[in-house]
């Protein structure tokens, strides 16, 4: 399963929001990846997410594969919206 988000936060995905996304993803057993600008990283890795330097207005793709993939994507979408990170 996959979902594309547009980053709306003025400061993009910096340390605090990256930590929130990693913590959300880490609650699930599925393999969850984030793709940005041709690079694909494990969404459960803070260093991987931070290495992408995701800016405002960027499009990111999050993919989840596993038994709880749908729940994982729903939780990540909720975190993105609740924290004003993206839509």
UniProtKB/Swiss-Prot annotation:
Task: Give residue numbers for the modification (Tele-phosphohistidine).
Answer: 14
User: Which keywords, in A-to-Z order, does the entry hold?
Assistant: Cytoplasm, Phosphoprotein, Phosphotransferase system, Sugar transport, Transcription, Transcription regulation, Transport
For the modification Phosphoserine, the affected residues are 45
Effect after changing residue 14 to A? Not histidine-phosphorylated
Per the record, the domain of life is Bacteria
Please list the residue ranges annotated as the HPr domain: 1-87
**Main location per UniProt?**
cytoplasm
Record GO biological process: phosphoenolpyruvate-dependent sugar phosphotransferase system
Q: How is its activity regulated?
A: Phosphorylation on Ser-45 inhibits the phosphoryl transfer from enzyme I to HPr.
Kindly list the GO CC terms recorded for this protein.
cytoplasm
Q: Which residues form the active site?
A: 14
Q: How is it modified after translation?
A: The form phosphorylated at the tele nitrogen (N(epsilon)2), instead of the expected pros nitrogen (N(delta)1), of His-14 is not able to transfer its phosphoryl group to the B.subtilis EIIA-Glc domain. This form may be inactive in PTS-catalyzed sugar transport or target an as yet unknown acceptor molecule in an alternative metabolic process.
Pfam families xrefs: PTS-HPr
Please name the InterPro entries in this protein's record: HPr, HPr-like, HPr-like_sf, PTS_HPr_His_P_site, PTS_HPr_Ser_P_site
The reply on keyword Transport is yes
The places in or outside the cell where this protein is found are: Cytoplasm
Its biological purpose: General (non sugar-specific) component of the phosphoenolpyruvate-dependent sugar phosphotransferase system (sugar PTS). This major carbohydrate active-transport system catalyzes the phosphorylation of incoming sugar substrates concomitantly with their translocation across the cell membrane. The phosphoryl group from phosphoenolpyruvate (PEP) is transferred to the phosphoryl carrier protein HPr by enzyme I. Phospho-HPr then transfers it to the PTS EIIA domain. P-Ser-HPr interacts with the catabolite control protein A (CcpA), forming a complex that binds to DNA at the catabolite response elements cre, operator sites preceding a large number of catabolite-regulated genes. Thus, P-Ser-HPr is a corepressor in carbon catabolite repression (CCR), a mechanism that allows bacteria to coordinate and optimize the utilization of available carbon sources. P-Ser-HPr mediates glucose catabolite repression of cry4A toxin expression.
UniProt cross-references to NCBIfam families, sorted A to Z: PRK13780.1, PTS_HPr_family
Sequence similarity: Belongs to the HPr family.
PANTHER family hit by this protein:
PHOSPHOCARRIER PROTEIN HPR, PHOSPHOCARRIER PROTEIN NPR
Q: What is this protein called?
A: Phosphocarrier protein HPr
The organism named in the record is Bacillus thuringiensis subsp. israelensis
The gene name reads ptsH
